[in-house]
Amino acid sequence: MKVSVAALSCLMLVTALGSQARVTKDAETEFMMSKLPLENPVLLDRFHATSADCCISYTPRSIPCSLLESYFETNSECSKPGVIFLTKKGRRFCANPSDKQVQVCMRMLKLDTRIKTRKN
């Protein structure tokens, strides 16, 4: 009987602490996002950069710009530079920022963002 009460108490404590940790992480993410300097923000509400977003490798495929919704560049703390694109289907992938096609897509997305901003 004592073992089951102790186990139940432990389970309740772990559950409470786990949900609190998630709330804390969400609050930290929101705080970090509010401090990011964005010159021309092209990020959407459902797609945010965090300090942990770094590219380990680049996609070997050429992705058509028309399939892309937004992007952000990785920060200088990452071991290699990168551009993280978000597709219209919600997939994320890393690309090489020195690649000509990547630069074309980045310019196109910046232009699209400026046009949408002016219309609103």
From Swiss-Prot:
Positions of disulphide bridges: 54-78, 55-94, 65-105
CDD domains, per the entry: Chemokine_CC (cd00272)
Keyword field: Chemotaxis, Cytokine, Disulfide bond, Heparin-binding, Inflammatory response, Secreted, Signal
SMART domains: SCY
Protein's UniProt keywords contain Hydrolase: no
Tissue specificity note: High levels in adult lung, liver, skeletal muscle and pancreas. Moderate levels in fetal liver, adult bone marrow and placenta. The short form is the major species and the longer form was detected only in very low abundance. CCL23(19-99), CCL23(22-99), CCL23(27-99), CCL23(30-99) are found in high levels in synovial fluids from rheumatoid patients.
GO CC, one annotated term: extracellular space
GO molecular function: CCR chemokine receptor binding; CCR1 chemokine receptor binding; chemokine activity; heparin binding
Chief localization: secreted
Post-translational modification: The N-terminal is proteolytically cleaved by proteases associated with inflammatory responses. The processed forms, CCL23(19-99), CCL23(22-99), CCL23(27-99) and CCL23(30-99) exhibit increase in CCR1-mediated signaling and chemotaxis assays in vitro.
Primary role: Shows chemotactic activity for monocytes, resting T-lymphocytes, and neutrophils, but not for activated lymphocytes. Inhibits proliferation of myeloid progenitor cells in colony formation assays. This protein can bind heparin. Binds CCR1. CCL23(19-99), CCL23(22-99), CCL23(27-99), CCL23(30-99) are more potent chemoattractants than CCL23.
Recorded family membership: Belongs to the intercrine beta (chemokine CC) family.
Protein name: C-C motif chemokine 23
Organism field: Homo sapiens
Gene: CCL23
